[in-house]
């Protein structure tokens, strides 16, 4: 692998994660640039080997520079998959699946809110009523059926968690779904 001398990053990491990122490139000069400061970003990448972006590839980094790798710190590279990016011949990578655990939990959070009528419960609590009509009919997620469209990183992570909650899962994906014998396809 060629020696990496300079890394430019625009990611908004906390101190601990920024320190961990710097340790990936221990010998390199490390330069943080605000993603929205396009002039400084364009200037700093001129002699950089690696650029780690919080967003998509911006035209300001496609000028004259020494970049050998661009990493977009998010899933989905549609905004960076453009002819002018490919023309440079610089590998562009993304972070598919990075947020899958949090997104799965986010889905479950809303599913539970819906099952347990959180809005009604909070309104009753604010009115100092400690019972809600019909609450004896409410039931949780266990035994219910859920549909998941797309079994990429997020869909797989969600399926694993919903299976642990005892849900029946029906899933659809454009590719064969492998390794999930509990899913109805």
Q: What are these model-predicted stretches?
A:
Residues 90-145, 160, 172:
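Phosphate-binding beta-alpha-beta segment of Rossmann-like dinucleotide-binding domains, i.e.
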Residues 13, 56-57, 76, 96-99, ...:
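Short, flexible active-site-adjacent loop segments at beta-strand->alpha-helix junctions, enriched
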Residues 135-185:
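Rossmann-like dinucleotide/phosphate-binding beta-alpha-beta segment
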Residues 15, 79, 100-102, 156:
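Loop/helix-junction capping segments adjacent to catalytic residues or to phosphate/diphosphate-binding pockets
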Residues 31-36, 50-54, 125-134, 178-185:
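Short gly/ser/thr-rich secondary-structure transition/capping motifs
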Residues 40-43, 79-83, 102-106, 179-183:
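Short, charged, surface-exposed secondary-structure boundary motifs
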Residues 1-93:
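An N-terminal-biased, well-structured beta-alpha scaffold segment characteristic
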